[in-house]
């Protein structure tokens, strides 16, 4: 984190990431703990939505975000193809049990294992130490992350191919073979909001899996070419810089997801998420429902699509502000100068020379 040259800098309790900045073991513990929280929230929220689900009202009008996502990937349907919530409780309970496993892993890494992997038990462990101004170290860790993302894409593609996912074009769950047409994949970079068939959606995921796993292997196996210069980030690459990159990525993905969710009914089927939205502008952009949802059981009476879209957009917006904040700090700007300048306005004096 940015210390402005102070080797003994301290952070408030709210700056939780600061205590794991240079300690990869603690960083892993934090990752596992966060994953456990997410898994528990997903499982518990799914059970809550299932308990309050009213089959007489469209799912998209009940703000059932977790149920809607499960229905989209073909979970919860009976043998007749009707969504009844079958097996949904089992999925939720598995997530809750998994959260306990993640919590155990977090506590183990936090309390029992080395906080700094540079002192780890073997050379393999030590490769994952955190050296923020060492591009070879960071690219090695990045490579493993990319491979995990690629494996997740493969899992989704295979799930759709073997089990099947919901296709709004026919109103039923079906098995989907991915379309690995590179021309379509390239063109969908620019019109992805208009994708209207699942084959192209799965083809994009299959292509991403290849790119991410190939890129991951490349980053693990290679080191930088030539001297590590300022042009390549020397003196700038830091924990704060990497944090800013991460915030930019997740912020951009959230905003893209908001636009996609607002209008696309192939990836976000209308029966589960509600009708497409209309974009409006006030103090900031926002999306509103285009149909009457007076029977909605959701808080404030909106569709699932409206809730999901607006929350994604505003989270994405604030993540991007966080990106700018941390990126500017990583470049060396001291925001305390702004605070001091504002605080000194009442003491400022203007001298006019003849």
Swiss-Prot record:
Keywords: Chlorophyll, Chromophore, Membrane, Photosynthesis, Photosystem I, Photosystem II, Thylakoid, Transmembrane, Transmembrane helix. GO terms for molecular function: chlorophyll binding. It is a multi-pass membrane protein. Its cofactor is divinyl chlorophyll a; divinyl chlorophyll b. It is found in: Cellular thylakoid membrane. GO terms for cellular component: photosystem I; photosystem II; plasma membrane-derived thylakoid membrane. This is Divinyl chlorophyll a/b light-harvesting protein PcbG. The antenna complex functions as a light receptor, it captures and delivers excitation energy to photosystems II and I. The Prochlorales pcb genes are not related to higher plant LHCs. The antenna complex consists of divinyl chlorophylls (a and b) and divinyl chlorophyll a/b binding proteins and binds more divinyl chlorophyll b than does the antenna complex from high-light-adapted Prochlorococcus. Belongs to the PsbB/PsbC family. IsiA/Pcb subfamily. One of its GO terms (biological process) is photosynthetic electron transport chain. The chain crosses the membrane at residues 27-47, 65-85, 88-108, 201-221, 241-261, 308-328. This low-light-adapted strain contains 7 pcb genes.
